[in-house]
Amino acid sequence: MENSWHIHLIRSRRRSVGIRIEDSGEITVRAPLRMPEREIRQVLESKRSWIEKTLAKISSRPQLPKLTAEEVNALADRALKEIPPRVAARAKQMGVTYGRITIRNQKTRWGSCSAKGNLNFNCLLMLCPEDVLDYVIVHELCHRKELNHSPRFWAEVAKVLPDYKQSLKWLKTEGQTIIGQIQN
């Protein structure tokens, strides 16, 4: 196994091995309590190509300065002012209802929608282009019709934003650079 990999092993009651690569390049491996280390190494070896590709992608990303707590709070305040009216307008356009709107500082999600219709949005959306912000809002509101990512769900997104794939691509390529600005 590659010596330059920084691996953090967490044992838990899970049934399978999970691998997560942090922006720092640290690899977090979650494995069943009784799984032998040999088997964990085999899983890592089988995922070597993906791990190396992901690590290369991380190291090639531009390193933006970390946001201070004050800057994150300012983004959250701005998001609290700007996102709810946009959600209300899109919900009316789409004919859907929703519950509470919460603004959070998250490292893994841009938005989410609960089964009760409560919406969560990442304050870092304030650093994204407007069309990307609109895409995330529409994406979450479409979950009010389809609480999954089935073809029907994506058809709902496309009805409202026919070119949504451009915003989705932007999030996948540029989003991690923005999320990388959060202090650990």
Locate each region found by the language model.
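Walker B catalytic acidic pair
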Residues: E140
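Active-site-proximal or metal-binding-adjacent scaffold patches in catalytic folds
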Residues: M1-Y135, R144-N184
